[in-house]
A protein has these predicted regions:
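Flavin (FAD/FMN)-binding glycine-rich loop and adjacent Rossmann-like elements that form
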Residues: 1-218
């Protein structure tokens, strides 16, 4: 379960500090489930429904049936040769050096929670916007040349927080990972930096393995 406001320190925290954050999430989730099951302020029908749920008996048996790791939806991202933004996935969707086509909508979770009074709050930051197919350019997976010349980043790619929501799915990461492998072999073979490979040749190799680069090919 999301805990708006508590996620911000994670990326910069030590392992010990992350354990504290993890415990906060566990305590919050445990408390919320107990509240929904037992508190008289909760409608009786909802309490009855929630009373039917419990922890999975055959999972994480050595950890009180809780997952060992906190699910991290997003944390650090590279600032690369090109930063993919909300505009790139909504309006300026065509890119000359395209290496893959994204299509997922923007589904940003709540970022902050504000208390209105003793019984009410407002969540902020939620975006649920249907998108369109958009080009993902090569610069999104390459670092700035002055910082590194032999690195390709298909997962923690160079995107804004909003654009990251649209490429964070495994099918997209799988294709970007495959593209990274192709680009890496070209860089090694040509003894060049990853920024200096021939993107047109890369595109031909991408298409040769069955990854479409034109939206009409989907």
């Amino acid at each position: 379960l999301s805990m708006p406001g508590e996620q911000t320190p994670w990326a910069e925290s030590s392992f010990e500090e992350r354990e504290v954050i993890h415990k906060k999430y566990r305590d919050y989730t445990h408390g919320l489930l107990w509240f929904l099951k037992t508190d008289p302020r909760v409608p009786a029908g909802m309490r009855e429904d929630m009373a039917q749920y419990g922890f999975c008996k055959d999972e994480w048996q050595d950890n009180d049936h809780w997952p060992w790791y906190l699910y991290i939806r997003a944390a650090r991202r590279m600032q690369g040769e090109y930063i993919l933004t909300q505009a790139d996935v909504i309006t300026s969707t065509d890119k000359k050096n395209v290496i893959h086509i994204g299509s997922h909508y923007i589904d940003a979770h709540h970022v902050t929670r504000y208390a209105v009074d003793q019984d009410h709050y407002i969540n902020e930051g939620r975006i649920w916007q249907e998108g369109v197919p958009f080009d993902i350019p090569y610069g999104v997976i390459t670092p700035k040349s002055e910082e590194c010349e032999n690195l390709l980043v298909p997962v923690c790619a160079s995107t804004s927080a909003v654009a990251q929501c649209t490429i964070r799915l495994e099918p997209t990461w799988m294709h970007l990972g495959e593209v990274s492998g192709i680009a890496a072999t070209m860089s090694i073979k040509n003894q060049s930096s990853v920024q200096d490979i021939d993107v047109a040749e890369l595109q031909e190799r991408i298409k040769a393995v069955g990854i479409p680069l034109k939206q009409l090919s989907l």
